[in-house]
Each structure stands twice: as structure tokens, then as C-alpha cells.
């Protein structure tokens, strides 16, 4: 028997100390990593519930275990809500992460040696879209598309390559591309060459849900996403698909890739999806875009180059070469000033992947804590202040003091 009042601090002080330290870091630092966000207390409560104890292999109404009547309710709510958000025919909410969701699509439609087409990792794509070291690059023949001289997706070159190579699957989506993606153009190309069209909106899902970024669901055979990032849920994945693909996708997840689903996480997904259906969520996502635009414009005014010249989403890539600093060093010094970002390669980057010539900046997390136009402008100027004098300890200390004053006014959790 367990006593509910015996918590982590009594059972495992070492883990409790690490949790408390991370809580403090999140409160005191401005989070600018584009793939991170803050889940609501309601989402975290669902994820920390007793649903973690329940095995539920299968799907609602078709389980391999008894006692699933209540977790069935949770999963069906998650399915119904995510379908409503995106206007999808069918949905699977069981993937443990975005990579699992992508792998399930490959398992459903491809055989080893088939040709796939995705965006080059070096120009903004994701490692699960064909990187050589990823299973997608090892199991399949990969053809990549990239950017034109304006650092926009080269749709004409993509179309030519598709007709030349006749891929079985075409993937749209990116992890470091700031502009809107023309999903309709991709869909027409996929149809012309007889390819399955898959879209990975892991980064853009929250924006799509709020109607402030193009929705690929009407155009794609399958759409995958994570449930954290801009969607602001627990860490996990989803797959949306046309009705005719539901059986193949569901079989690819279970029993193809996974066993028992994480019912506590699925319940937390359902809570996040309900939050995403609210008017407040749309207002939030509109502010995410506004904040990103202000940050990009301010950094440009301070002498930094934004890849593609602008942002039309929640993120941007910043070329640091004019400041004589690498992405690796910028990540470290900005971290010292209590601003968390990640180093990121820019197109045709001469530096190694663990060094890079750029950083990626995103606004979902800062917006969740309440930052609006003025705070976005202040944050961008603080970033530039650090990058102007990255090796000046007094400068870093002064910026850190300003960051701490700002974060104290906007706590993540009150």
C-alpha cells in the first residue's frame, strides 16, 4: 500500500533536488529553443495520474487486456479532439514521439530500398526525413530537395527531382525552416508521380491548430506531429490520415512498432487538445507569430542576418558570421546570460554540425509565460547585447541581471 503524502522529496532526495533545480532554471531563464514549451498544470496532472499503471495494448474497444473501459474513454477523447482540431478523417494518438510517428508511416507504406524524398537536413529538414545515420537514411534510397538562392524551398527543383526519381513517398516539413510551406504544391507533385504525400508538422502544429499557418491535412495522405513544441502538450506523437489509410497506420503502430501505449500520456494529450480548441489558444498562437516577427526584425536592426530574410512562423535561423562567433559559443554565452537557445547549422554552413555558424530561435515558450510585443523586443536586444560582446564577463553579468528582472515579472507557473 502506498501513502499519497509520501512524495519524491522523501523517497528520492537526489532526484527531487534535480527536479527543483530544473524548475528554477525554467523560471529564471528565457526559453528560446523553438522545440520547447511549457505544459499546463492540467496536462502535467493528467500525465502524473494513475493511468500510468494501466496496460492497454490495442485500440479503444479492441484491447488485449481487461479493465480498459476508462482508458478507452481517455484515448477516444484524444482521438476525437485531434480530428476536430485539424479536420482529419482519422487519427492515431499512440506514438511515443514524433520519430515513432514517422517510422510508422514508413512501415505502413514502404519496403527497404524504396525511394523517399525529403528536405535536406543541411538546409532545414529533420533527421527522420532521410539523414544517412537515421534509419530513414539507412533503409531507403533518399533523394533530397533544398533551398534556392533566396533561401526558400526550391519547389521547381523539387518537382524536377520527383519526376526524375519517382519516389514512393514525398515528405514535406522541416525543423529549421521559418517560412510557410506550400503543401498544395507538394500534393500536386506527389499525385503526378504516384507518391504517398506525408507532412511532418511537428514544429508548426500549434500554429496550424490555431489557423495561423497553412493546414496540410486537406492535401496530404498522412500528417505526423509531436504533441509538445507549439502544440503545448506532453512529449509524444500523433498521426492524422485519410480514412483509407487508417487500418495500415494503426497496424504499423501496434503491433508493428509499439506494444502497450502510454495511457497517462494519452490522457495528457487529450487535455492539451482541449486547450488547443479554446479561443485563448488562437490568441496565444497569434502572439507567437507577432513575437517571432519582432525578434527577427530587431535582430536584423542590430546587424544580424536572418536566414530567408524573415520569419513566417514561430522560429528563425540567425547567421552569426558577421559577429565572428560560432553557434556553439553563442549557445554557451547566451546560456550564461540566462537565455537558452540551440546552435544550428545554416544553409551551406562551413562549420561542423557540433559547432555551426548559426543559432535557432523560437518564441512559443516565451509567449506562454506572457511575453508580448515589448518583451519580445527587449529579449531580442538582450540577445544582440550578448552577441556584440560575447567575451566580456561584465556585459554578460549585466544582461543576466536584466533577464532575471524580466523573468521575475513573468513567472511560468504562478
Curated annotation (Swiss-Prot):
<dbReference type="GO" id="GO:0005829">
    <property type="term" value="C:cytosol"/>
</dbReference>
<dbReference type="InterPro" id="IPR039429">
    <property type="entry name" value="SHMT-like_dom"/>
</dbReference>
<comment type="subunit">
    <text>Homodimer.</text>
</comment>
<dbReference type="InterPro" id="IPR049943">
    <property type="entry name" value="Ser_HO-MeTrfase-like"/>
</dbReference>
<keyword id="KW-0663">Pyridoxal phosphate</keyword>
<keyword id="KW-0554">One-carbon metabolism</keyword>
<protein>
    <recommendedName>
        <fullName>Serine hydroxymethyltransferase</fullName>
        <ecNumber>2.1.2.1</ecNumber>
    </recommendedName>
</protein>
<feature type="modified residue" description="N6-(pyridoxal phosphate)lysine">
    <location>
        <position position="229"/>
    </location>
</feature>
<dbReference type="Pfam" id="PF00464">
    <property type="entry name" value="SHMT"/>
</dbReference>
<comment type="function">
    <text>Catalyzes the reversible interconversion of serine and glycine with tetrahydrofolate (THF) serving as the one-carbon carrier. This reaction serves as the major source of one-carbon groups required for the biosynthesis of purines, thymidylate, methionine, and other important biomolecules. Also exhibits THF-independent aldolase activity toward beta-hydroxyamino acids, producing glycine and aldehydes, via a retro-aldol mechanism.</text>
</comment>
<dbReference type="GO" id="GO:0030170">
    <property type="term" value="F:pyridoxal phosphate binding"/>
</dbReference>
<comment type="similarity">
    <text>Belongs to the SHMT family.</text>
</comment>
<dbReference type="GO" id="GO:0004372">
    <property type="term" value="F:glycine hydroxymethyltransferase activity"/>
</dbReference>
<feature type="site" description="Plays an important role in substrate specificity">
    <location>
        <position position="228"/>
    </location>
</feature>
<keyword id="KW-0808">Transferase</keyword>
<dbReference type="InterPro" id="IPR015421">
    <property type="entry name" value="PyrdxlP-dep_Trfase_major"/>
</dbReference>
<feature type="binding site">
    <location>
        <begin position="125"/>
        <end position="127"/>
    </location>
    <ligand>
        <name>(6S)-5,6,7,8-tetrahydrofolate</name>
    </ligand>
</feature>
<dbReference type="InterPro" id="IPR015422">
    <property type="entry name" value="PyrdxlP-dep_Trfase_small"/>
</dbReference>
<comment type="pathway">
    <text>Amino-acid biosynthesis; glycine biosynthesis; glycine from L-serine: step 1/1.</text>
</comment>
<comment type="pathway">
    <text>One-carbon metabolism; tetrahydrofolate interconversion.</text>
</comment>
<dbReference type="GO" id="GO:0035999">
    <property type="term" value="P:tetrahydrofolate interconversion"/>
</dbReference>
<keyword id="KW-0028">Amino-acid biosynthesis</keyword>
<dbReference type="InterPro" id="IPR001085">
    <property type="entry name" value="Ser_HO-MeTrfase"/>
</dbReference>
<dbReference type="InterPro" id="IPR015424">
    <property type="entry name" value="PyrdxlP-dep_Trfase"/>
</dbReference>
<dbReference type="GO" id="GO:0019264">
    <property type="term" value="P:glycine biosynthetic process from serine"/>
</dbReference>
<dbReference type="InterPro" id="IPR019798">
    <property type="entry name" value="Ser_HO-MeTrfase_PLP_BS"/>
</dbReference>
<feature type="binding site">
    <location>
        <position position="121"/>
    </location>
    <ligand>
        <name>(6S)-5,6,7,8-tetrahydrofolate</name>
    </ligand>
</feature>
<keyword id="KW-0963">Cytoplasm</keyword>
